[in-house]
Amino acid sequence: MSTQSLYKVSSEIAENAHINEEQYKKMYQESIVNPEGFWREHGQRIDWIKPYTKIKKTSFDDHNLSINWFYDGTLNASANCLDRHLEKDSDKVAIIWEGDDAKDQRTITYGELHSDVCKFANALRSQGVRRGDIVTVYMPMVPEAAVVMLACARIGAVHSVVFGGFSPDSIASRVIDGKSKVIITADEGVRGGRIIPLKANIDEALSHPDVDCVEKVIVLERTGGDVNWVEGRDIKWESLMDTASEHCIPEEMGAEDPLFLLYTSGSTGNPKGVLHTTGGYMVYAAMTHEYVFDYKDGEVYWCTADVGWITGHSYMVYGPLANGATVLIHEGVPNYPTPARLGEMVDRHKVNILYTAPTLIRALMAEGKEQFADFDGSSLRIMGSVGEPINPEAWRWYNEVIGHEHCPIVDTWWQTETGGILISPLPGATDTKPGSATRPFFGVQPALVDNMGNIIDGATEGNLVILDSWPGQMRTVFGDHDRFALTYFKTFRGMYFTGDGAKRDEDGYYWITGRVDDVINVSGHRLGTAEVESALVAHEHVAEAAVVGYPHDIKGQGIYAYVTLTKGTIETEELRQELRKWVRKEIGALATPDLIQWAGGLPKTRSGKIMRRFLRKIAANEVTNLGDSSTLADPAVIDTLIESRLNRSE
């Protein structure tokens, strides 16, 4: 690894951060050698009703799979996010909210949030919700979404948040799986200037013939738009809150009692409900939030993720609020109505910590740095990236244009299933390399294995596994423990298989290469699609790229690249050939794209994830049965890509 690609921790940051390099190594070693002792100490960072005495009872044996942490202790997640701050921080701002329209703004103190949560917890009880019941939540990005989650946690109900971009069919499958009696929604949402018909989607979902469990639908008025109303079933949020008491004693929950369900997107067949429990999850979310973002009391923290994803759960609600942070919640998208919106919000709210996704960074890159000519950014101290591996070129742009080259970047790798960040730099402890998630968090033991499950040491590439449990880990697939074992523990026995491939360099840094099924086998050689994409995006005229394999008569698989050009760049055959030569120079002849299709847009979910299965089918000329496209932000993109595809049958 060349020294040019190494960004050293500055002495100022190392001196003022929670931990430096030496302390990280000491703590990490202790967490691996003596996990019980390590977590016995660090589990005390949250409040327990009945203190734990038993720390860890875990087995990755797929025939005897069980995960238990702090398992004889009791606590309440809502109390940890609210009640414990009231004595000295009741007037501290918990949530700053900015609507899709920047003129819509609210601030909510910890005292006010506590009152709202208690009221809604009592409202839920008035509608028959009891401990252990699953409550489906389909809300816009408003403070009330956090209120609902914390209210469920307060009374021991299990929330199942469904991303507001999901279709009625997706909602129905989740409601059926969880047998929800109560659904929480809003009349409409607002995102990027568009109205999202939330209540209408719920109505359509509940018309599904297999949905027979729902008794009540609680509806928040967000826009005041006209909605269908079912008497006896639908209830106004406001009428419940007007009469509810603001006193609600938090339910005493076991550490291993469920806190929430979150269904993984893109799962085939029945939805896969990832189940997280209370104690270990809260410890891990709070601890990773503090150390990875080097959070200091009084700072303003902005995670741009939607609450419908795990990032919104762990790093917009539970982790930051457990640590007493001031959290910025934004209803819209950070590049609407103009690409300058992100910078304007950072400056307006004096954001200290920003956590966003590579897809947004690339979208802003494509618009050009002149969009940030008026951006001050002096409040920013730490910046994070989440959701997919970040291309080195996007990392450098983020560092230069948003961070003004003075903010450490934490490129975090984790999953819905892991509950919290597993591999990431720590700002005061880790020299960074653009594109690398670097080193594991405390208690996390990553390894690389070959396809036979043999551990491979040193600088190498392989399948990324985790060798032992950590507190934030999911406990099961809801209602299907066999599926949990089959999906994560049978591929490589005795190890948690992440489904991702990775490289490890000579410094022990991890580089995530993408999903194992995002590997192209070209003439017997395995190529990670992320590597080819990074090379393409490094070209000055490329804003975004997605690479897939397609059937090739000679090579087995060929390389098919979908390329979105920067604003003002003209699509020419000369540029196409230039890009092929560019990739050949950057990686080698083997990685040269066979086909490069110009793409005005790529098929993405509203969280910004590229739906590669559509791209694979289009590249393979299998365009008659693409499957459900209802979760796409813009389904029309598919038709455009099909129309201009390059691999047509003769």
Swiss-Prot record:
Domain of life, source organism: Bacteria
Record: residues binding Mg(2+): V537, H539, V542
InterPro entries: Ac_CoA_lig (IPR011904), ACAS_N (IPR032387), AMP-bd_C (IPR025110), AMP-bd_C_sf (IPR045851), AMP-binding_CS (IPR020845), AMP-dep_synth/lig_dom (IPR000873), ANL_N_sf (IPR042099)
Record-listed N6-acetyllysine modification sites: K609
Cellular component, GO, one term: cytosol
Residue sites binding ATP per the record: G387, E388, P389, D411, T412, W413, W414, Q415, T416, D500, R515, R526
NCBIfam families linked to this entry: Ac_CoA_lig_AcsA (TIGR02188), PRK00174.1 (NF001208)
Protein known as: Acetyl-coenzyme A synthetase
Organism annotation: Shewanella sediminis (strain HAW-EB3)
Lineage per the UniProt record: Bacteria, Pseudomonadati, Pseudomonadota, Gammaproteobacteria, Alteromonadales
Gene symbol of the encoding locus: acsA
